[in-house]
């Protein structure tokens, strides 16, 4: 699973990445093995993913959140949903 956090490294984007990593851990998954959490900072790459407002979260190519910091619980829910596909 690939979880991308799109943003320019601002505090909101950092909080989003932290929540994504925490969600992976709480689900008993290993960061870097079961799920790769990557930060996308390049404006062109962010735009290519259809993101207009950061932070945004994309899981396996599907944008699940944009323009706000999702809670760890929300990210866990999205991960579980994506695992079923």
Predicted feature residues:
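Local sequence-structure signature of Cys/Sec-based thiol-disulfide redox active-site neighborhoods
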Residues: 1-22, 26
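Signature of N-terminal electron-transfer/Fe-S-associated modules in redox systems
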Residues: 24-26, 54-55, 70, 81-82
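Alpha-helix termini
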Residues: 27-31
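Thiol-based oxidoreductase modules, predominantly thioredoxin-like and allied folds used
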Residues: 32-43
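Catalytic cores of alpha/beta
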Residues: 47
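Structural micro-motif
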Residues: 50-58
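Non-catalytic, surface beta->alpha helical segment in thiol-disulfide oxidoreductase systems
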Residues: 60-85
């Amino acid at each position: 699973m690939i979880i991308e956090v799109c943003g320019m490294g601002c505090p909101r984007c950092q909080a989003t990445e932290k929540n994504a990593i925490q969600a992976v851990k709480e689900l008993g998954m290993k960061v870097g093995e079961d799920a790769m959490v990557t930060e996308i900072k390049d404006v062109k790459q962010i735009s290519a993913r259809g993101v207009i407002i950061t932070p945004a979260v994309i899981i396996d190519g599907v944008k699940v959140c944009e323009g706000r910091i999702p809670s760890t619980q929300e990210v866990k829910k999205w991960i579980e949903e994506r695992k079923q596909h």
